[in-house]
């Protein structure tokens, strides 16, 4: 139901039941380092190109969110994915191994919110029961696409914009679920679970009027 000029309220609530994050080494060194599920040391993830590495980040994020939910692709109705690259190639190849209908979305820095809004609409409308939303970026591939390719050797101050190397994935459902716990300490495996009890899950809604 439309609320105001820019907001939508769903009659059927939609929940983020699980979330996963995979980031590069620089992100792991920042103030949020202990909040990520996986911090990798090799930003290339043993791939041959930055674009392939970004795809690998997406795949890992989706794998982790499904592992947290104890589910598999057969139980997922739709996968919404997006990235910063031309033709969304990171998403196309990153999700290629998942036998799930895939819709690619592009919203630059708003891609995460865009996938969540669209995924929630599918569920609230009764067209899907479980939807995975995933987005990614990679510092090196973004530099190549929008700024100065690393091979150019451009000098950059530490205060300049730095695109995240990482990926985030969410599992949406029309039914709430419980997550194991909320922790503030990074484990040795760099894995972290965070969730909220089912009775406190709020439906996804755009509250801006």
Roles of regions detected by a PLM:
Residues 3-6, 120-123, 155-161:
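A generic local secondary-structure boundary/capping motif
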Residues 106-133, 172:
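Active-site-proximal alpha-helical scaffold in enzymes
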Residues 82, 131-137:
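Short beta-strand segments
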Residues 99-102, 143-156:
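Short acidic, glycine/proline-enriched helix-loop-strand junctions
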Residues 88-94, 114-116, 142-146:
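Short, conserved acidic/polar surface loops in the N-terminal third of protein domains
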Residues 85-87, 109-111, 138-140:
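A short acidic, glycine/proline-enriched capping/turn motif at secondary-structure boundaries
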Residues 1-103, 162, 168-209:
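Conserved "HGTGT" condensation-loop signature of ketosynthase/thiolase-family condensing enzymes
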Residues 136-140, 145-147, 176-177:
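Short acidic/polar capping segments at secondary-structure boundaries
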